[in-house]
Amino acid sequence: MEYSDKQIAAQEAVRYIKDGMVIGIGSGSTVNEFLYCLAARMRKERLQVVGIPASKKSERLATELGIPLTTFATYQNVDIAIDGTDEIDDQLYLVKGGGGSLVREKMIDLVAETFIVIASGKKKIKKLGSFPVPVEVVPFGWQATEQRLQQFGCQTNLRMVEEDIFVSDNQNYIIDCDFKEIDDAEALHRSLKQIVGVIETGIFINMVDKAIVADNGELSILEK
């Protein structure tokens, strides 16, 4: 059987899961592969774990696969977080949020003792910016917030689903900001966060402990 790069990265990530762990579950297609692999290992080894999902989509799939779920009300500490990414650079900085779950993903990834990113090789780039930076904003006055975002030299698009405005799991809007190329991701993130109305950006700085990247069947483990 020939596996996709997403499946190869997911299979490697499951090796880091130990019995009794609280797992932060990100979102996206690569994380879906991780959930399939995790469920298979749980059945085979009777592995006992619980997960905290970052999105309703991940929550639904985990439930379908029989993976027990919990919340921060029960566990405030996360042993390991597994998440995908839209872009990752040489510093292991990320642009995430194409699925619209960036706030919850960042909350989980920040509190995790270990944060592992899984990705296919096409997500590995030299400099962030080829993928628009998602910015989650308060719905009230979003037009004014968008105008202030544009002052940073980006092209902006309010995220839509067909004819309707996309609404995040937190009931907010997302403005996708196309910077083309980001020279200083850390400074940009700080500046965007200072805009009133901005809740969070999809730039993830100094958070990743390990990246598992599969490119044309070849596996690479990247660490700082």
From Swiss-Prot:
<feature type="binding site">
    <location>
        <begin position="27"/>
        <end position="30"/>
    </location>
    <ligand>
        <name>substrate</name>
    </ligand>
</feature>
<dbReference type="InterPro" id="IPR037171">
    <property type="entry name" value="NagB/RpiA_transferase-like"/>
</dbReference>
<feature type="active site" description="Proton acceptor">
    <location>
        <position position="105"/>
    </location>
</feature>
<feature type="binding site">
    <location>
        <begin position="83"/>
        <end position="86"/>
    </location>
    <ligand>
        <name>substrate</name>
    </ligand>
</feature>
<dbReference type="InterPro" id="IPR004788">
    <property type="entry name" value="Ribose5P_isomerase_type_A"/>
</dbReference>
<keyword id="KW-0413">Isomerase</keyword>
<protein>
    <recommendedName>
        <fullName>Ribose-5-phosphate isomerase A 2</fullName>
        <ecNumber>5.3.1.6</ecNumber>
    </recommendedName>
</protein>
<comment type="subunit">
    <text>Homodimer.</text>
</comment>
<dbReference type="GO" id="GO:0005829">
    <property type="term" value="C:cytosol"/>
</dbReference>
<feature type="binding site">
    <location>
        <position position="123"/>
    </location>
    <ligand>
        <name>substrate</name>
    </ligand>
</feature>
<comment type="similarity">
    <text>Belongs to the ribose 5-phosphate isomerase family.</text>
</comment>
<comment type="pathway">
    <text>Carbohydrate degradation; pentose phosphate pathway; D-ribose 5-phosphate from D-ribulose 5-phosphate (non-oxidative stage): step 1/1.</text>
</comment>
<dbReference type="GO" id="GO:0004751">
    <property type="term" value="F:ribose-5-phosphate isomerase activity"/>
</dbReference>
<dbReference type="GO" id="GO:0006014">
    <property type="term" value="P:D-ribose metabolic process"/>
</dbReference>
<dbReference type="Pfam" id="PF06026">
    <property type="entry name" value="Rib_5-P_isom_A"/>
</dbReference>
<dbReference type="InterPro" id="IPR020672">
    <property type="entry name" value="Ribose5P_isomerase_typA_subgr"/>
</dbReference>
<dbReference type="GO" id="GO:0009052">
    <property type="term" value="P:pentose-phosphate shunt, non-oxidative branch"/>
</dbReference>
<comment type="function">
    <text>Catalyzes the reversible conversion of ribose-5-phosphate to ribulose 5-phosphate.</text>
</comment>
<feature type="binding site">
    <location>
        <begin position="96"/>
        <end position="99"/>
    </location>
    <ligand>
        <name>substrate</name>
    </ligand>
</feature>
